[in-house]
Amino acid sequence: MSLQINDVAPDFEAETTEGRIRFHDWIGDSWAVLFSHPKDFTPVCTTELGYMARIKSEFDKRGVKIIGLSVDPVDNHAKWALDIEETQGFAPNYPMIGDTDLQISKAWGMLPAAANGDASKRTASDNQTVRNVFVVGPDKKIKLVLVYPMTTGRNFDEVLRVIDSLQLTAKHKVATPVNWKHGEDVIIAGSVSDEDAKRTYPKGWKAPKPYLRIVPQPRS
């Protein structure tokens, strides 16, 4: 069964390029992004892993840990990293999980429970559903799920934008409108009454409709 927003992220132990981890312990009190790819040494994923390495400092600034996953063994990840650095200018600077028995991919709903457990015999096409992005909060719950086809590279700048929104709305009773970026106006959450809103926003708000109350972004 696919994971839904607010589900608890399944915990697991796994070998990674940076040693063995238990996922929930590894997250600690941080946010996390787990992103998966169907096979090492594939073209689109090569560009994705390189770009993620390039912008990882932006995730660091937001207190977000990054971890990748594929069904290939960890030693394959290490070899692939050389190609990624050569072609993209950046080598992965975050751990990569080797899900060789497919157990994590199954637990996270990326592969069916009946999938063949021998990863070495599986092709990228067999694993094409293993192209997900999950954002996990400090409470270990799923905050975002994105699924991409093999032919479409992921937009990690959009993941950063969503994390900005998630972190802001976790602290303040607001929502972010279409195409919102950090620093732009936000919407007072519908669960907040006008009376409560007046206490939080004594300068008032713009309201083109009673249900659409617009205010400057609160300071963190």
Task: Indicate where each model-derived feature is located.
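Chalcogenol-based redox active-site neighborhoods
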Residues: 1-220
